[in-house]
Regions:
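C-terminal accessory/regulatory regions appended to core domains
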Residues: 1-152
Length: 152
C-alpha cells in the first residue's frame, strides 16, 4: 500500500499543513501533468497517484482512514470495518424525528468527532480512532443526505 504522506514528503500525521499540501500538489501537477508527456505511462501513473493522494490527504475523513489503513485497520472495507454503534444510530434517528437535524449541528458534531480521532491517532489508539471515525463518517453521510434533500 502506498503511503500518500511519503509521496508529498509530509509526516504521517492527522494534523497536516493543508497549505503545504496544496503547494506541493500544484508543483507536482506542473511536473507530471499528462499533457507534458503524451503516452508515457510512468508519468501518467504518477499523475494519477498524485491526484489520488491529494484527494485523500485533503479530506480529513479520508486522511484518517488512510492512516488507519497504514496501521492495519481498513475502515473502508465493509467486511472488516467496525460497524456504526447503536448509540450513534439512535442519536441520528432522534435528531431526525425531533426535527433538530441541521447542517450546522452535523458539521459541528463531525468536527468534534474528528478532534477525538486526531487525539486517538496521536496516541496510537487505532481501534478507538477507527470506531470514532466510523461515527464521523455516518454523521457525514447524514449531512450529505440532508444537503441533497434540501436541493430537491
Amino acid at each position: 500500500m502506498k503511503n500518500f504522506f511519503d509521496l508529498f514528503s509530509l509526516p504521517t500525521d492527522f494534523s497536516i499543513d493543508l497549505d503545504t499540501l496544496e503547494k506541493k500538489y500544484f508543483e507536482f501537477q506542473k511536473k507530471f501533468h499528462p499533457d507534458k508527456y503524451g503516452d508515457k505511462s510512468d508519468e501518467i501513473e504518477q499523475s494519477i497517484a498524485i491526484n489520488e493522494a491529494y484527494e485523500v490527504l485533503s479530506n480529513p475523513l479520508k486522511r484518517a482512514a488512510h492512516i488507519l489503513r497504514l496501521n492495519g485497520l481498513d475502515v473502508e472495507n465493509d467486511v472488516v470495518a467496525p460497524k456504526v454503534d447503536q448509540a450513534t444510530l439512535l442519536e441520528v434517528f432522534e435528531m431526525r424525528e425531533s426535527g433538530d437535524l441541521s447542517a450546522k449541528d452535523l458539521s459541528q458534531k463531525i468536527k468534534s468527532l474528528l478532534e477525538e480521532v486526531s487525539k486517538n491517532l496521536g496516541n496510537k489508539n487505532f481501534a478507538s480512532a477507527a470506531q470514532i471515525l466510523i461515527r464521523a463518517k455516518y454523521f457525514e453521510k447524514t449531512l450529505q443526505d440532508l444537503k441533497v434533500k434540501k436541493w430537491h
